[in-house]
Amino acid sequence: MKILWITNILFPEAEQLLVGNGELKSSGGWMLGAANALLQKEDIKLIVSCVSNKVSTLSKLEGKQITYYVLPMGRSNQKVNLAYMSLWKQVQQEVRPDLVHIHGTECSHGHAYMKACSCDNVVISIQGLTSSSSYYYYYGMTKWDVYKNFTFKDLIRGTVIHEQKQFKKRGEYEKDMIRMAKHIIGRTSWDRARTWAINPNAQYHFCNEILRPVFYDGSSWDYMYCSKHSIFLSQAHYPLKGLHQVLKAMPIILRHYPDAMIRIAGWDITRNETLSQKIRLSGYGSYIKRLIMKLNLQDKVQFTGNLNAEEMKQEYLKSNVLSALQVSKTVLIH
């Protein structure tokens, strides 16, 4: 059985084949776990395809057990890109998959496959619903917060208000994907309710994600060994992840727990010491920096840098509290 995956990330093995190195230090690790599980089945051939700016033409790569098709990113996969359609037809004709699994509805290359090829053997899985979350993209910030933190990067790339508009546009082809789909995979009642509202005729399949093997080595969180009163955020580089809301709550937390600390996975979005950092500083990063200073939290916030699976696991084990605050998406926990 041939299964074609269409993903939003370049798998580490494919990156190694392209540029000689590769380690996943971003979201999407559950796909590696699921791929490893599928590869235990002898009757399954897995083909993984994505878009990347590391190639300029459609590239086929042979991994140890997985065949990869990497499409050139082109203009962007954040908006409708008709160039993907002919490439997907080429991939489909060469692979002739029995099943196509599109991981996520956030990007236009999955939408392009459904437009270019038959949807009869396609299942889409919900990772995040941009059509819903766009309304709350910078919830907790005012437009004045956006304008007074305008940066050079905002001039080139746009402010969070522009990003919200882009989310809304992406939400339109996301809804089109859901309307076309005959099968949808989700994890939460929110996934089910939102997709049913768009396409009540699609068959819904519940399926939790599989993590990478390192998360199943028997380690378990223990209060005795955690860093007391530490709060961990697994990502927070754009407003939807709610870092600004956690910072606003921190003065109240500090009244009761003066030694409380916030640790955030990922690069430091507030750094602006060098010219390069000043150029790359986003308006949201500037807003977070001002908020930290206003609330006198300079010694209470740490960015860890990008983490691999083992490093992420250690952060989960060390933290006293995990804050996975997110406004109106597939997850809402705090």
Q: Where in the sequence are the language-model features?
A:
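N-terminal subdomain of nucleotide-sugar transferases
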Residues: M1-V55, K64-I66
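Active-site proximal beta-strand in glycosyltransferases
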Residues: K2-I6, L99, A116-I156, I185, ...
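Conserved donor-binding/catalytic core segment of Leloir-type glycosyltransferases
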Residues: L4, D222-K241, L247-L254, I262-A265
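Short alpha-helical donor nucleotide-sugar binding micro-motif in glycosyltransferases
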Residues: Q92, Q314-S319
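Membrane-proximal helix-turn-helix segments that form the acceptor-binding/catalytic region
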Residues: V146-H183, A193, A197
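Acidic donor-binding loop of glycosyltransferase active sites
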Residues: K182, L317-T330
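Acidic anion/phosphate-binding donor-loop and adjacent secondary structure
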Residues: W196, I210-K228, Q314
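Nucleotide-activated donor-binding/catalytic signature segment of Leloir-type glycosyltransferases, i.e.
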Residues: H205, L275-N306, E310
